[in-house]
């Protein structure tokens, strides 16, 4: 009886220690970060096609949204390692109403921005989607025409 009591207490202790822990598993070759999983895709797509591609993984998947400097730095490092500064990368920020009101495709709050100097500039009045800008090591953002083909980064909650 003592052996079963010991095992039971061990299982209870393990359960209690994990009950508040975040538990998720990202697919192989996805980056786990703050309860989300991120993956860079190097096959260039328009912003809308990239967003639709991300959504096909499972409900709640979108182009990546970035809300803090620390997350921006981590994703920039991940993208740099993956692409080796080979092209800009779509993220989920866009201006669907074309009124310079930026929103994330996952509808999360948009109170953090990391624009490159002079951006967003809406060059030729046709830049309504946002990419991580390769010349800045993917740390800064640039608005661009949504039809432009770029690699992209998806985020999913698993």
Curated annotation (Swiss-Prot):
Subcellular location, in the record's words?
Secreted
Q: Which UniProt keywords apply?
A: Calcium, Disulfide bond, Glycoprotein, Lectin, Metal-binding, Secreted, Signal
Stretch forming the signal peptide: 1-21
Which Pfam families did the record assign? Lectin_C
Domain (C-type lectin) ranges: 33-155
Supply one GO molecular-function term: metal ion binding
Q: List the disulfide bonds.
A: 26-37, 54-154, 61-156, 129-146
Which SMART domains would you find in this protein's record? CLECT
Q: Give me the residues that bind Ca(2+), please.
A: 127, 142-143
Looking up CDD domains in the UniProt record yields: CLECT_REG-1_like
What cellular component terms from Gene Ontology apply here?
extracellular region
Cite the record's tissue specificity text. Answer: Expressed by the venom gland.
Renumbered to this chain, motif Mannose-binding spans 119-121
- Residues with glycosylation annotation: 121
List the InterPro entries. C-type_lectin-like, C-type_lectin-like/link_sf, C-type_lectin/snaclec_domain, C-type_lectin_CS, CTDL_fold
Similarity field:
Belongs to the true venom lectin family.
What's this chain's function?
Mannose-binding lectin which recognizes specific carbohydrate structures and agglutinates a variety of animal cells by binding to cell-surface glycoproteins and glycolipids. May be a calcium-dependent lectin.
**UniProt subunit comment:** Homodimer; non-covalently linked.
Put simply, this protein is called C-type lectin BfL-2
- What's the source species for this entry? Bungarus fasciatus (Banded krait)
């Amino acid at each position: 009886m003592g052996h079963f009591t010991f095992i039971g207490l061990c299982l209870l202790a393990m359960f209690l220690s994990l009950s508040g822990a975040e538990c998720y598993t990202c697919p192989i070759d996805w980056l786990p970060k703050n309860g989300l999983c991120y993956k860079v895709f190097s096959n260039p797509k328009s912003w809308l096609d990239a967003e639709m591609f991300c959504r096909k993984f499972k409900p709640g998947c979108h182009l990546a949204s970035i809300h803090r400097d620390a997350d921006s730095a981590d994703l920039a490092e991940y993208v740099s390692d993956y692409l080796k500064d080979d092209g800009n990368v779509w993220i989920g920020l866009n201006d669907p109403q074309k009124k310079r009101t930026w929103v994330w495709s996952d509808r999360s709050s948009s109170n953090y921005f990391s624009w490159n100097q002079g951006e967003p500039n809406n060059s030729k009045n046709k830049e309504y989607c946002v990419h991580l800008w390769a010349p800045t090591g993917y740390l800064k953002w640039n608005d661009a025409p949504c039809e432009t083909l770029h690699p992209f980064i998806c985020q999913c909650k698993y």
